[in-house]
Amino acid sequence: AAAVEAVAVHTVFTTHTAVPAGHDHFSEEMIRRYFEHACKELGVSNEQLLALGRVPGGHEFNMTALAIRGSRFHNGVSRIHGGVSARILSSLWPQIEADDKPVTHVTNGVHVSTFLSSEWNELFDRFLGPGWSQRVTDRSCWEGIHTIPDHQFWSVHQSLKAQMLHLVRHRISEQHARNHGSEAHLDRLLKLANPDNPNVLTIGFARRFATYKRAGLLFENLNWLREILCNPQRPVLFLFAGKAHPADQPGQALIRRVIEVARMPEFEGKILLVEGYDLRFARRLVSGVDVWLNN
């Protein structure tokens, strides 16, 4: 108990999702089997270890319960999510009202230096002055943005968009080959993703395919979507990327829905789902798309 407390007072636990599939749990028998030797070395019983991961009425070892008991500061990733998490985890503090549960929140943000491209960094260094990246929350820091000549601003954006489209074409070509698709079909899929003519309005949606992120909201009204995507005078390209947790069946169903709509003849080449989502691809998408879709 003293060792757990010593660790807990220096530990912060951030819970990221309300989706049950994102909270791992394992059979107590598995925990006993793999941790029996460690328990003997530490001088604790199997029961003491298992108690750290139990939830009331449960018979499995819950990793979220372990993290809660092994920390003294707990937070969600937005004000609403903090409240939702407090209610979800309320069984761990049955003696405390939900509104008083020790789960607070932080507001998720973006680490600018990680996701901003080197091209934008160089441009901002010239026009916003040295040290701007340390003052991104200071409104006055961004007054210099209006002094950037339009042609320079647009040139950087179009260059990054072309780089992104090169990567999109490469990845779509690879996944098309894995699926034994024809060259003619590939040409139709990539007709709008043209890095030599990056003037098609390109909209990106890339994140985990969890139901509450509403990846399928765009497809609730297909007639409205047709009006947007089937105007030859104003071509639009939607790029989807992301992964679902292996145990999240509804999340996987969302991916299948995106593929289903993308395969409709009228949407061919106008909605692309790019496989193999990772941080490298995320950076390219953030830098290259015209609009970031957030449902």
Where do the PLM segments sit?
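Catalytic cores of carbohydrate-active enzymes across secretory and cytosolic contexts
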Residues: 1-295
